[in-house]
Every structure is written in C-alpha cells, then in structure tokens.
C-alpha cells in the first residue's frame, strides 16, 4: 500500500507589526474671523495655544487662550508695540 505524507505550509510568512500608522487629530487653531468682518458678541475670533495674539478692546480671553468678541462690531487686527499683535472689536457705526 502506498502511503503519502502531505504537509501544507502557509503561503504567507508571519508579518511583523509596525510602530507607525497613527496621528493625532488636528486642533483647528488659527483665525476664525477676518479683519473688517462684522461679528456678534460671543463669537470666537482666534483659537490658539498660548498668547500668539493678545486681546484688545472688547475682546476676551478664554481658559484655553481663545479670543472672543464681547460686543457686536467689526474685527480689527492690530500691532501692539514692535513685536506683538492684538485683535479688537469696535462697535459698528450706525
């Protein structure tokens, strides 16, 4: 009697894992309103980490350094001294 000993081997080798392949979600920082744009009170003007831009007239700063409008008006990005920037909101002339 003929006896066959068949052995089947895997066609793919065991694949190693990788340490790459993931990234954090973007935080969507930056300007949310443009210079000269009309905004309502409470509108977010600029999202940031730290004080890249300082709050000016009628602008508040949140716990995460987000700048927001305190009143309805027009946004104005300005220089504050030589090396600083600020954003202000001025009441729209009626």
Curated annotation (Swiss-Prot):
Residues 20-32 have a biased composition (Basic and acidic residues). Residues 1-9 form a propeptide. PROSITE patterns: RIBOSOMAL_L27 (PS00831). GO terms for molecular function: structural constituent of ribosome. InterPro entries: Ribosomal_bL27 (IPR001684), Ribosomal_bL27_CS (IPR018261). It comes from Staphylococcus saprophyticus subsp. saprophyticus (strain ATCC 15305 / DSM 20229 / NCIMB 8711 / NCTC 7292 / S-41). GO terms for cellular component: cytosolic large ribosomal subunit. Keywords: Ribonucleoprotein, Ribosomal protein. GO terms for biological process: translation. The keyword Ribonucleoprotein applies. Residues 13-32 are annotated as: Disordered. Belongs to the bacterial ribosomal protein bL27 family. SUPFAM superfamilies: Ribosomal L27 protein-like. This is Large ribosomal subunit protein bL27. The N-terminus is cleaved by ribosomal processing cysteine protease Prp.
């Amino acid at each position: 009697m003929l006896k066959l000993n068949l052995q089947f081997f895997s066609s793919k080798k065991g694949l190693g894992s990788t340490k790459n392949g993931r990234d954090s979600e973007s935080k969507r920082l930056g300007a949310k309103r443009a210079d000269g744009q009309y905004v309502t009170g409470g509108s977010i003007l600029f999202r940031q980490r730290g004080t890249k831009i300082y709050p000016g007239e009628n602008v508040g700063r949140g716990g995460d350094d987000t700048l927001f409008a305190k009143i309805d008006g027009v946004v104005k990005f300005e220089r504050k001294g030589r090396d600083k920037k600020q954003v202000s909101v001025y009441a729209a002339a009626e």
